[in-house]
């Protein structure tokens, strides 16, 4: 059940924007009758009741997402491709197929403390998305410093690493946005594969694009074992693997 969402991003575009009238060059605002219908739908969605819910399985493992995730949809460029959203599925499916629920963490929400509540391990990759603001790295680094475990998967070789953005303009000379993040956590700009300490937390670097975890049969074992080992060391318990999920919502199972 999807019950956590933003009903209408940018309402000013809907109610105050000008839209072309079909078959003419004229523009006008949204028709009054349609705006009334739209507002009725908005109010209904705002009032949908929710209940406490829980998915069985090991909790506290998340995968980082960003608004830029859908920007990199060019199928093939300079010999690099990410077919069928494979980099995202490479981070999530190896866990889901073992019965481990995955929490999706939105980078744009990192300024809010509630974003990291209950989170022990965060997996991320810049192979399929890029940070739109450098400030997000401050929040990620601070979470690690306080005890979080960050697992970075990626070779940083996709062509989008070289687009003109904040990490390579205005005096910044980073070859990839991850270099800025690693530097924030007192690591070298391009650390090799391995485990590093930062404050009370840990940074684990895996130099393989996550798409390979699903595009190559049986290639997700190392990825899973890395997460399982990190979880065991932090929590003192083994990750629970199973072949099913049970959703408990209110009085229902």
Where are these regions (language model features)?
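Hydrophobic targeting/anchoring helices
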Residues: 1-90, 188-194, 203-247, 253
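Catalytic-core regions of glycoside hydrolase
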Residues: 1-10, 96-103, 127
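Short, well-ordered alpha-helix to beta-strand connector turns
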Residues: 2, 118-121, 147
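Acidic-and-aromatic substrate-binding clefts and catalytic sites of carbohydrate-active enzymes
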Residues: 13, 110-113, 128-134
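Extracellular/periplasmic catalytic domains that process cell-envelope and extracellular macromolecules
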Residues: 54-58, 115-117, 145, 196-198
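A short, well-structured beta->alpha microelement
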Residues: 93-115
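Short, well-ordered secondary-structure micro-motifs within conserved domains or adaptor modules
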Residues: 116-128
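A conserved amphipathic helix/loop scaffold
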Residues: 126, 130-253
